[in-house]
Design a protein with these regions (language model features):
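Short, Lys/Arg-rich, polar N-terminal cytosolic tail immediately upstream
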Residues: 1-28
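A structural signal for multi-pass alpha-helical bundles of membrane permease subunits
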Residues: 29-330
Length: 330
C-alpha cells in the first residue's frame, strides 16, 4: 500500500511594490535643495580647498613675491627639522596651550554654573560676560596693556594691597606668556560659557532631585551628575580651545610683538614673519601644513580621551553611598 504525499501548491512570486511616481513639486523641492547646497559647497571649494591646494603646491617651491620660483620638493619640510626657531615657537605654543586650555575650561564651566539660575539679573550678566567676545582684539589688548602696567596697572595695584610685589608682566620673559593667557581667557570665555549653559540646561532635573533625596551634597551632584552629563559638551569646548590655542597670533602680535626675548613667539606668529616679513612664502606654507598636522593629531587624541560616543552608555562604577547608583550610571 502506497501513501499519497500531499504537496502544497506553489506560491506565486511576490511582486515588488510599484514605486509611486515622484510629483513635480517633490522634484522641484529636491532640485531647489541641491541648488541651496551648491552655494555653500562652491564657497567652500573656492575659499578653502583651492587655497589649500595652492598652498600645498607652494610649500614644495621656493616661491617668493619678488623673484623667480623654483621647484624644491620636500626641501622646505626637511628644513623645518633643523630650524631652531621653529622649535622655540612650538615650545612657546605648547606652553600657551597647556595654560590656556585647562584655565579656559574651568572659567567657562564655572561661570556657566553660576549663571545657570533663574534670577532676573542672570540675563544681564550673560550679556556682560559675552561682550569681550564681540570686542576687537586691538581694543581688548589696549585695555589689558594698561591693566598689566608694572607701575600703575590695576592688577599690580590690587596685588600691592596684599603686600605682593607684582611682576613686570609684559616685560619679563617668565610672565609675558602668562599675561597673554589671562587676556585670551578673558576675551574668549564668553562663547564657551554659552555652550556650557546649553549643556547644563539639557541635564534632566530629576537626576539632581534623586541625588538630593539620597543625601548627595553639591560637590557629589557636580561630580556624579553634572560632569558625566556634559561629556559631549566638554569634548566640543576642549577641541575648540585646543584649535584656538595652536592658532594664537593677534594677542602676541599686539601686546608683545613676540618678546621679550622671543618668549611669546607662537607658531602662527612665526609663520607670519616668514611669509610676510622674510617673504619666504614656500617655507611659510610648509610650516602651515606642519601646524595643521599638529592640530589634527591633538584633536584626535582629545577625541580619543573624551570618547563622546560613549557618554550615553550606562557605565557601572563605585560611588559613595550618598549618591544613588542610578544617578552615577548616567
Amino acid at each position: 500500500m502506497t501513501g499519497a504525499v500531499a504537496t502544497a501548491p506553489a506560491r506565486a512570486p511576490r511582486r515588488a511594490p510599484a514605486q509611486r511616481p515622484v510629483s513635480a513639486t517633490a522634484r522641484q523641492m529636491r532640485r531647489a535643495g541641491w541648488w541651496f547646497l551648491a552655494v555653500p559647497l562652491g564657497l567652500f571649494v573656492v575659499f578653502m580647498l583651492l587655497p589649500m591646494g595652492m598652498a600645498a603646491v607652494i610649500s614644495l617651491t621656493d616661491y617668493a613675491i619678488i623673484g623667480d620660483t623654483a621647484w624644491v620638493g620636500w626641501e622646505n619640510y626637511a628644513r623645518i627639522w633643523d630650524d631652531t626657531f621653529f622649535w622655540t615657537a612650538l615650545r612657546n605654543t605648547a606652553r600657551y596651550t597647556l595654560m590656556y586650555v585647562p584655565l579656559g575650561l574651568v572659567v567657562a564651566l564655572g561661570t556657566a554654573l553660576l549663571l545657570n539660575r533663574s534670577y532676573r539679573a542672570v540675563r544681564l550678566f550673560r550679556t556682560l560676560f559675552y561682550i569681550p567676545v564681540v570686542s576687537s582684539t586691538v581694543a581688548t589688548a589696549t585695555i589689558w596693556y594698561w591693566l598689566l602696567n608694572p607701575q600703575k596697572g590695576l592688577l599690580n595695584v590690587a596685588l600691592g594691597w596684599f603686600g605682593i610685589d607684582g611682576p613686570r608682566w609684559l616685560y619679563d620673559s617668565q610672565w609675558a606668556m602668562t599675561a597673554i593667557v589671562l587676556m585670551s581667557v578673558w576675551a574668549g570665555f564668553g562663547t564657551n560659557m554659552i555652550i556650557f549653559l546649553g549643556g547644563l540646561q539639557g541635564v534632566p532635573g530629576d537626576l539632581y532631585e534623586a541625588a538630593r533625596l539620597d543625601g548627595a551634597n553639591l560637590w557629589q551632584q557636580f561630580r556624579y551628575v553634572t560632569l558625566p552629563s556634559l561629556t559631549r559638551t566638554t569634548f566640543l569646548v576642549s577641541t575648540l580651545l585646543i584649535i584656538g590655542a595652536f592658532q594664537v597670533f593677534d594677542q602676541a602680535y599686539v601686546l608683545t610683538k613676540g618678546g621679550p626675548g622671543n618668549s611669546t613667539v607662537t607658531m602662527v606668529y612665526y609663520i607670519y614673519n616668514k611669509g610676510f616679513g622674510s617673504l619666504e612664502m614656500g617655507y611659510a606654507s610648509a610650516l602651515s601644513f606642519v601646524l595643521f598636522l599638529i592640530i589634527l593629531v591633538f584633536s584626535l587624541v582629545n577625541a580619543r580621551l573624551n570618547r563622546p560616543g560613549d557618554s550615553g552608555r550606562v557605565r557601572r562604577r563605585r560611588v559613595p553611598a550618598a549618591v544613588p547608583s542610578t544617578v552615577a550610571a548616567r
